Amino acid sequence: MPLYLDEHEHIPGLEAGALAQAHARDVEVGAGYGVNYLRYWFDEATGKVFCLVDAPSPEAAERVHREAHGLVADRLMEVTEGG
């Protein structure tokens, strides 16, 4: 399956605990769509978040974010994992 990296430019009031809950919800909802949210990185000060996701399509990845918590990414790009 393709691997995608998404970027959320600014999530107002971003907190580590709330983000961990949102990621857990992505994992839960994603199971029903064949989508696996693998990891995420964030900067609490700027509200910027990056998510790494294994999904059959960009639309499937977006659908999971929308259904899980409504925080849809500003950008989504297909990536290849390196060594």
Protein language model regions, located:
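Short S/T/G/P-rich N-terminal loop/turn motif that feeds into the first structured element of a domain
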Residues: 1-32, 36-38, 42-47, 64, ...
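An amphipathic, aromatic/His-enriched active-site/gating alpha helix that lines ligand/cofactor pockets
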Residues: 56-83
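Short hydrophobic/aromatic beta-strand micro-patches
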Residues: 9, 52-54
